[in-house]
Amino acid sequence: MHHALHFFYPNEIWVWAAFAASLAAVNADTWATELGVLNPNPPRMITNLTKVVEKGTSGGISLVGTLASLAGSALIAFLASLLTGNWSLFLVVSIAGLAGSLFDSFLGGTVQAMYYCPTDKKETEKHPLHTCGTETVHLRGWTWLDNDIVNFSCGVFGVVVSLLLLGIF
């Protein structure tokens, strides 16, 4: 991919920033989710930091998860800077990746479609059937905005933030 982008845009730093920021955002989100569960305290809802939520709740954030998100973003930023030789990318991509991850949490806590499994008595993203095989009931959010679209939006938001930081928009 490095060579294909370089062929079409050899001296355009914004292309590299956008590409790396999309990867940084989704990596940051993955690290936040996977490592955030290690936080000793329960997460808080991103839209109301006084509201305690269960681990794994869409829109829930924690200190460990947020730091993991920053680390995941910084790793991609470091690799992008190393591969391009342009160390000014590091801060832009790190910030954009973290912002994308937080945007993912914001969407998850506000408008992402969430469902309820009457058998397990749990909130879930699964629809029409929960993993136990029970039909889920819509609780909140826009029914068309599933977790896949939220994840895609995370990457796009990272790109937009990187371009804003570079002054492209």
Task: Please provide the spans of the model-predicted regions.
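Hydrophobic alpha-helical transmembrane segments
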Residues: M1-F169
